[in-house]
């Protein structure tokens, strides 16, 4: 019973960590990386799909992403989708490939992005702590129903706390890495 609660809590915490990682990927740094376009949606025969499902997305150099559509008619649609996204990018069509140069981030914009990233990290930490609270409540209910002993409850809460500490530390580590990326000129 304790292991089931622990396993459930760990799965939920892992999902929270994955969601935080995806949120971090949406925040662009000064450097180009192909993942930045993963959330840009393109109209493909009536349905919205991510850019990486209708084109090859590659790095041309450290500050430029190349997007090569698999179908020529998609070129203009992809270019428009990138331009209309909230990423602040200005793609340029070069024959069969779209070049997406990454603009330099201003100091003010970097600080704003760091605030956003810290907010996302705090949201992830709160989610992990809520999972801990829910698990501890389950242990208390089991104790009240006399399904487990007080020692089992204490042991379960300690294990959940260790998981909470582990995932919170992982969130902090990811935050520090992203902040360093944002501050790098």
Curated annotation (Swiss-Prot):
Main location: cytoplasm
Key words, A-Z: Cytoplasm, Protein biosynthesis
Classification via SUPFAM superfamilies: Ribosome recycling factor, RRF
GO terms for biological process, alphabetical: cytoplasmic translational termination
GO cellular component, one term: cytosol
Sample GO molecular function, one term: ribosomal large subunit binding
Gene3D superfamilies with a match to the protein in the record: 3.30.1360.40, Ribosome-recycling factor
Superkingdom of the source species: Bacteria
Compartments it resides in: Cytoplasm
Family designation: Belongs to the RRF family.
Protein name as catalogued: Ribosome-recycling factor
Organism: Chromobacterium violaceum (strain ATCC 12472 / DSM 30191 / JCM 1249 / CCUG 213 / NBRC 12614 / NCIMB 9131 / NCTC 9757 / MK)
């Amino acid at each position: 019973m304790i292991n089931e609660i622990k396993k459930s809590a760990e799965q939920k915490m892992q999902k929270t960590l994955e969601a935080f990682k995806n949120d971090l990927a949406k925040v662009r740094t000064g450097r180009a990386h192909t993942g930045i376009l993963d959330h840009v949606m393109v109209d493909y025969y009536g349905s919205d799909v991510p850019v990486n499902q209708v084109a090859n997305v590659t790095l041309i150099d450290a500050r430029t992403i190349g997007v090569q559509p698999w179908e020529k008619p998609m070129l203009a649609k992809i270019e428009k989708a990138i331009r209309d996204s909230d990423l602040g990018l200005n793609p340029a069509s070069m024959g069969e490939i779209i070049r997406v140069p990454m603009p330099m981030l201003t100091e003010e914009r970097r600080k704003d992005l760091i605030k956003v990233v810290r907010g996302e990290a705090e949201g992830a930490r709160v989610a992990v702590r809520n999972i801990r609270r829910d698990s501890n409540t389950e242990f208390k209910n089991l104790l009240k129903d006399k399904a487990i002993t007080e020692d089992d409850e204490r042991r379960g809460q300690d294990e959940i706390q260790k998981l909470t500490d582990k995932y919170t530390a992982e969130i902090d580590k990811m935050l520090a890495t992203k902040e360093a990326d944002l501050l790098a000129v």
